[in-house]
């Protein structure tokens, strides 16, 4: 039986109650969804730490980037530039202003830098420090919707899935069948180090991807100089003492693991005198490694006093492994000491001999052991420690000897079959690089460039006095950041067709982009669904086409942890009992766990009802006893994204169709009147709310005023004065009205509450675009029949009723933006006007005095939208001429029409808004108005500030009423209160709250101090908002509108068009059931029910069996029951209505249980032979509208080289007559038509103009000439050196 999902809402006075949905869910909701936009908002605010006072900022994000690059010193250590803190100012413009004027929504970034200079005066060192605030440029700031506005367009920074830093082990099979193993260390920043075995079992190390050296050479260079040390460290050999010959003979026949070397003294003798000039130690190999001990070896060993040997271990069972890789490698190693090893590596790196030992050691250390050049990051160190089972301090961000030894040890274990290679597609090896981190790396790039120029300037300025401002060039950082937002592959123009498309774009994960994969290189494995995607990345929602599997979507419950790995929540199971505790697990942690499904039956006491529970463990699905279960899924829809979660009966659809269904919901055009689906999944409200396309109540309160454009809510004020916030009790919300989205659809908010209503925190107050009663509404519920209809619905085509057109059921509003600039040209300034030369009065009737079309005017193709004249004339006018023209206003003779006109296909447009942006004017009248407006802004600012200060002191004294002072000073160090004094109001008469420090000890009570600090922080935040608003208003008055250089004025006109549904438009349901409208039939011709109701839509039943998307049938039947009963349903995926439930609802509605009824032919009135499945289906109109695709060329542009018409609608191009079309004309023997097509109608330049002339004169067409493409071919051949002439 369905239950009510939201409880019975009976609040009186609501304009429209959000109807509760009857839910079929059996599994209770135990864990709430995270905010769906956290993936953007949280990471950005963690990066900028905008709500944290400078002194309290953690060493992450922007703060960490500054700390990484500062201090900067000159070469002689005389000057040091240190970073103190950074400040973020309020944005100069609002989001709306930026969108309207084509600006970037950004905040000014300022840093306080300290320049310390050391100078020697009279033998003593004098230190001078200058601290200064320096402007570092503007930083694009994220809006509260999780987007960036760059040059007026909303953009999204997509998160990137890339390979995590750390050590990775791989295995491959050589063509001869040998198993080859390799390891790779990938840092965040710095050179890669690689290791690999070859077919002879030698282990090589690749340093900085250059030439290879035996791994033992690298180990020696790191300090493990002797063979004995190396084999002992890896426990590869038995150390055997041979004190006498008997002990030696015990080991005869065994192999040496290391070579036996001796040191000999060689005398260097002068040939002329015979004197010994010098002595040199030389190392000589007595017995090589892998040598089998023989009886004759004892004498040599005894002679040189060798008492210990390292022999290959006997306890290795497998004969193939009796020689260790390392023993083979030692054979290849030409070095024997640390010094020799360092020299070998230096030679490989630099291609020349090392000048000295220190240089050789420094070359290696700079690559992997220097913090400035190498950084594993927190993630890399965490992964290294976990994978290699080493215990290196987490603050150590460079490679260590333990790491290298750990990697070699792991490679030996791999070769011995004791360990397994890494799966590169496992989500423990892939991490998310979110917005904040991407911005951080760009910022780091900009700061590194800036640091270089600062250093250069320091070195150049010797005796000059200079300040931090003289050293810093703000444009350096700004240009890097702007390039990132403008050109980076992950900075994308936001898909804004509807609220779901917007939200999905922000939650997208891309494997492409800088440092990621490319479409061409990505194979099947990396695109495939992996078992670690469960609950983290959606297995359904991914694009079709070349990006399949590379662009993924976050699951509903998925979050990103501090290391950037994806986590998903699970309920903890203890001793077979499911607890209410929830833990987030990363893919690595989950590998150790056994996880039960969300639908496993549980008793009232939390124990599993069955003795055997089906679970997941890594990639398997074992059936285990309840005691062995560690965790349980929190929800059945945990494995999919919000988009796939909105598809009811998803479990009855084939995965390919489910993919199409979830993708096509994003293409649904917001309709004039949207309906939320009768059959939903219960997630519609949450998606609509989290998409931020509606206004949500910030607390409990009462709606004071409502109209179509604004909404005023009075929130309940806390009765006690100890409330630490400064929220305004009365909030006014300006509603978004008919705003154009990125895709040209219409964004419009309308209130769903009435004046006098009580609202609660989180309650939806307005509908956004594609919303109804606070729920997502992408389409319409229509009565549908599954049957063929006179062949019109063949192959997925759709037949619809004329009612859907006449009643505007699928009518949508689309908005186009027209922009026209007025420039200052060499010949004089252009001008907006309605007085245009050689244009009739009729053509300018809708233009106002500025030459801009009036709001409400209807636009047809060719109409003037913005009237503009531009000066013409061969010569520039002299000042006298300019004066005479200004006096007599004679413009007609020397100006030409440069008006903006409506393009073809613009029928039915209505002007809904016009804007004119102008530079600041400086005439006396304007100046006077400006001064008055500035005065008003200033007085308004002072009033708001005084009110805020009063509220602060009121709350402050309420907190410290019974407390005594711990000794209080202001920021300048001046004593305000002595220790033990009471907090008297008189003592603070002259004190401004902003002078108090958030870190001061106000009282002896720690808890009270924290409360005061919070109050002070909230005060400063509110004050910053007020000052930012004032600054913005003043800037607007003083500077006028910001326009590009050379532009004097810019006019923008917004034209709205209603698009009714028509033949050729694409429609789709939520189950991948898409089709194109082939016929709009009269209502009277449509099949009708017993009671005479005609159906709205006829779908082909053959579209169901082969596509295997039965969800549409379930939805149709349940929708019909809901329509009859006046109920809306929630059928969550994997926990929804069964066939039995659907049948029950149909019976309750008085409909046949199987949903099949007798239909009658509208044309004849005769009953059809068979009963037909009928019901209410939810269908959307997609943005692939035929009107946007229809195109016909008259005269348009030609390609310069081939002289053929261009292709495509955007270029106003022609239709290509391709190879196959030419064959068709051959086949019909239409030689004249073919010749015409290839000459006059294409690229016979002379023939074209002659044909035009003859048509005009009414003469016969001339003979065709030579097509230009033939001339191009001739020139190509001539370019190859072949002489081709045409006789």
Curated annotation (Swiss-Prot):
Swiss-Prot/TrEMBL GO biological process terms: DNA-templated transcription
GO cellular component terms, A-Z: DNA-directed RNA polymerase complex
Entry EC number(s): 2.7.7.6
Key words, A-Z: DNA-directed RNA polymerase, Nucleotidyltransferase, Transcription, Transferase
GO molecular function (one): ribonucleoside binding
Catalysed reactions listed for this entry: RNA(n) + a ribonucleoside 5'-triphosphate = RNA(n+1) + diphosphate
Cystine crosslinks: none
PANTHER family on file: DNA-DIRECTED RNA POLYMERASE I SUBUNIT 2 (PTHR20856)
Function summary: DNA-dependent RNA polymerase catalyzes the transcription of DNA into RNA using the four ribonucleoside triphosphates as substrates.
The protein's assembly and partners: The RNAP catalytic core consists of 2 alpha, 1 beta, 1 beta' and 1 omega subunit. When a sigma factor is associated with the core the holoenzyme is formed, which can initiate transcription.
Family per similarity comment: Belongs to the RNA polymerase beta chain family.
Protein name (database record): DNA-directed RNA polymerase subunit beta
Provenance organism: Salinibacter ruber (strain DSM 13855 / M31)
Organism lineage string: Bacteria, Pseudomonadati, Rhodothermota, Rhodothermia, Rhodothermales
